[in-house]
């Protein structure tokens, strides 16, 4: 059902790796997903993947303050930074040498739009078609794509001040999981009153690593951008026996949530970013 749609999405859905190194020397990486929108390198992804970067900026200010105090008359009375303070941070945007510029993060909506610098349009053969939001209906078959289940070791080269991550073939490790559209969720508007907080709810959860990835229909048109997973209690409490002891279990249903493509298209239109829209006969939609 989704074979053709997945073949298209594999071209423009790419992994982003968020790597950090803390004061105690611990190096970790997490994976998310982004969607390349056009040949100019504009992308959309989830906003929360930048939380580590915000924390890094905060930690850097604190570390610099402590450094200044250590160099002052207080000297030895100044404590070291917290062991989990982030001292190095880096994003890897699907290709070496590529960095994100002109990024705008709508954290309350949980979306980010930005432009990849040093992007080569030849890297992506097919760009996404952003669906007509009026055609996203309850019960519609959908499929979510991203990069869960990736576990690898990241090193940090102290001399170069750079992270080293293993090579990956995104075409081989991308993972789809299917679902249906269950509901449209309206959470009102953002605090500044400028952005609609509208989402598409899905019958299966988004997995870690799929944040920022596309939720597509059977034709491959993007219906939403995956941002979160919510758990609902089923109010079933079966009693099970574990090692001779009776335990009451709570059962939950995990569902996914994606930013409605209607909102994404509106944000792109406001910034004059071109994209292919469902039903456009002329190809790319040019906003001047």
Label each PLM-derived region with a short phrase.
Residues 16, 34, 41, 45, ...:
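Terminal peptide-recognition signature
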Residues 217-288:
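C-terminal subregion of chymotrypsin/trypsin-like serine protease catalytic domains
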Residues 128-198, 206-210, 226-240:
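Flexible, gly/ser-rich surface segments that form the specificity/activation loops bordering the active-site cleft
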Residues 12-76, 117-119, 216-219:
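Catalytic histidine site
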Residues 1-36, 43-46, 109-112, 124-125, ...:
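N-terminal activation segment of mature serine protease catalytic domains
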Residues 28-31, 207-211:
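Short, small/polar residue-rich loop motifs at catalytic or cofactor-binding pockets
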Residues 2-8, 22-26, 59-123, 130-134, ...:
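Conserved catalytic-core segment of clan PA serine endopeptidases
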């Amino acid at each position: 059902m989704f074979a053709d749609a997945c073949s298209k999405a594999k071209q423009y859905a790419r992994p982003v790796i968020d790597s950090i190194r803390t004061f105690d020397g611990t190096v970790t990486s997490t994976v998310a997903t982004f969607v390349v929108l056009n040949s100019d390198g504009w992308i959309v992804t989830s906003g929360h993947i930048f939380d580590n970067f915000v924390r890094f900026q905060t930690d850097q200010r604190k570390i610099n303050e402590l450094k200044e105090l250590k160099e002052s008359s207080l000297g030895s009375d100044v404590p070291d930074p917290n062991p989990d303070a982030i001292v190095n941070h880096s994003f890897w945007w699907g290709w070496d040498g590529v960095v994100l510029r002109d990024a705008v993060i709508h954290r309350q909506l949980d979306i980010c739009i930005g432009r990849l610098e040093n992007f080569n349009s030849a890297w992506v053969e097919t760009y996404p078609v952003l669906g007509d939001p009026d055609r996203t209906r309850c019960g519609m078959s959908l499929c979510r794509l991203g990069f869960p289940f990736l576990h690898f070791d990241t090193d940090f080269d102290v001399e170069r001040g750079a992270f080293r991550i293993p090579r990956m073939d995104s075409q081989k490790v991308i993972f789809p999981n299917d679902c249906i559209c269950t509901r449209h969720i309206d959470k009102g508007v953002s605090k500044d009153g400028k952005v609609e907080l509208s989402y598409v709810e899905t019958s299966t959860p988004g997995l870690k690593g799929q944040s920022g990835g596309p939720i597509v229909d059977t034709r491959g048109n993007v219906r939403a951008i995956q941002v979160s997973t919510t758990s609902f209690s089923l109010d079933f409490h079966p009693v099970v026996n574990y090692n001779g002891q009776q335990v009451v279990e709570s059962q939950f249903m995990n569902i996914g949530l994606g930013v409605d493509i209607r909102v994404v298209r509106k944000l792109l239109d406001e910034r004059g970013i071109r994209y292919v829209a469902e039903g456009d006969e002329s190809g790319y939609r040019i906003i001047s």
